[in-house]
Curated annotation (Swiss-Prot):
Belongs to the prtT family. Pfam families: Zn_clus. It is found in: Nucleus. It comes from Aspergillus clavatus (strain ATCC 1007 / CBS 513.65 / DSM 816 / NCTC 3887 / NRRL 1 / QM 1276 / 107). This is Transcriptional activator of proteases prtT. GO terms for cellular component: nucleus. Gene3D superfamilies: Zn(2)-C6 fungal-type DNA-binding domain (4.10.240.10). Keywords: DNA-binding, Metal-binding, Nucleus, Transcription, Transcription regulation, Zinc. GO terms for molecular function: DNA-binding transcription factor activity, RNA polymerase II-specific; transcription cis-regulatory region binding; zinc ion binding. InterPro entries: prtT, Zn2-C6_fun-type_DNA-bd_sf, Zn2Cys6_DnaBD. PANTHER family: FINGER DOMAIN PROTEIN, PUTATIVE-RELATED, TRANSCRIPTIONAL ACTIVATOR OF PROTEASES PRTT.
Amino acid sequence: MTRTTTLEEVKFEIPTWDNNNHIEVADGSGRSESNASGDTIRPKGRIRRSMTACNTCRKLKTRCDLDPRGHACRRCLSLRIECKLPDTAERFQDNASMWSDATAAIPSIEERLNSLERSMTEMTSMMRQMVDRSPSISGSSVSLLTRSGLTEETASVEGSQPSFIAPRPIRLIQELQSDFLGEPNVLPAESRSLSESFSNGVLDPKLSLKLIQLFVEHFGSWVSIDSPSDIHNDLRPTDPLLYRTACLLASRYVPGIPSSVIQAEYLQIRHAAVNILWNSQPMKYETLQALTLLSLWPTTIQKEAPMDSWLLSGISINHAIISFDFLNHAPAELIVDNDMVAKLRLWNALCLTQLQFAIGNARPFHIQQRYLEHCPRLLEHPAATFDDGKMVAEIQLYLVTSKLQNDPHRMRSAEIEYEEIERWKMEWAHLLTGEQHSTLELNLWYCQLLLYRTAMKCQWESEPLVSEVLRNARLIISKFLLVRFSTALGFVDQTYYIVGYAALNLCDFNPMDPLIDQVQTFLLHLSPNEDHIAYRFSYTISELKRRCTACPNPNSAVKGAFGDARKLNLGQLHFMPQVLDTMMGDYSALEQLMPEVSPHSLPDMLNNVTGELQAGYRTAIL
């Protein structure tokens, strides 16, 4: 079948590029034929594009876009090559018509690159600041002790921000005790005042007089109490809170007192102290003595949560600044007399306690330098004692430790010997060998241990740091085992934290070290009851060692509180090696409570710390 199409039925409409040119259909094939040449029907823009392109774009047959801000095309600018544009009068006018105002506002590629470089520099600086302010924990296995204290705060000097890498030994030990022994009891909500019933106390009067004598003998030097008459005069206490606090501290030397009586005494004292802190100013000197004693021994009873010594000493320091007039003068303006000696001794004890618990809990230290300058003035008086010098030396030691811990550069350098510590040793060398039972060396080794553990957060695999941690931990425990029981019972709570932290480090790195069992047994024999700090430290060390030895991978250990069924009592000594003799059942004589520790309990290789180390327990934080 054939279809015929006439010319009139098929018409093509082709747009004309020029009004003077006409396009017609030549035949029925559908092809058009122009009466002008091919050049006349091309768009004008295509002709001008070839004339305005630079030499490089023309050779490469690429689009040549002229940068409105310069005399070069964008391709040549991005490649940073010379751009040769033809000299035409229409070039700039044509480019201005092609680019809109929005296009002209776009910066060049080079400027955008410069902006990106500046942004990357700022971002890198911000990332470094974030790293400096956050704990850096390596991807290696973290031990049981590490997981117990991952959140960090730390001590600082004069209100500076806490260091991001400082350990928290006191907080760590308290968390481990809550884990192993259960959470402490919640204190009753009711409060008590210093009424007549509080003044009389819950102890028998004759027993109270005996306790006051024991207090003067073992604790009085801390707060300038040399005679029972300083506390109890004319059959009446000079200050009820001081009197009751003295009896409470001395009760550890008389283990026959029922624990329920001691607990009731402790709760009344605690409530009274809270009420007194909000009394009108200025505060009595005797009351400040009692608050200082409670700051030094905050964990007398462990059934309830211990008093926060950092907070208690801080508030007491504020009261002392108001009550002690000499603190508002320059140190050289006043002469140190007998009255000022007693107040300076109290002031130094508060400052030292604030420093120790600020570092131990990784909290700020806010005492201004002008107040700290009064501390050494106590040594100017002829009545200054060895303990006074030791206290001033410890204040200087903890200040140096706090400054070093808050210097990230020094901690990252992982130094083995610190110049500031060495200068301190030279300055106080006469006190380091002054008395056999002095705790000054314990504090020195403890501060060094903290610095090494802080540095290990940046270089946790450093063998020299591990060796120094073990060496200082062994020195602390070995020195402590040489102390008489009667002397150890009078140690402030900070000393027990030092010994406990050293034992935990040994458990963390080398749980088979024999010193662990020896110090655990020593603490258990030392504790007069299960509520004493020594007993709880002994059990914490025992339980942590058991977990470290039984669990090859610390991360697989399950954290949880254990009930009373897992707790030990003083009659169950079968879980420990026979290092010391069995405790005596008759406590009628106080001397029977204070046996000597034989020298053979110390290890022969005191300085040999290159023994077998378990890599799984080399932690970044303790």
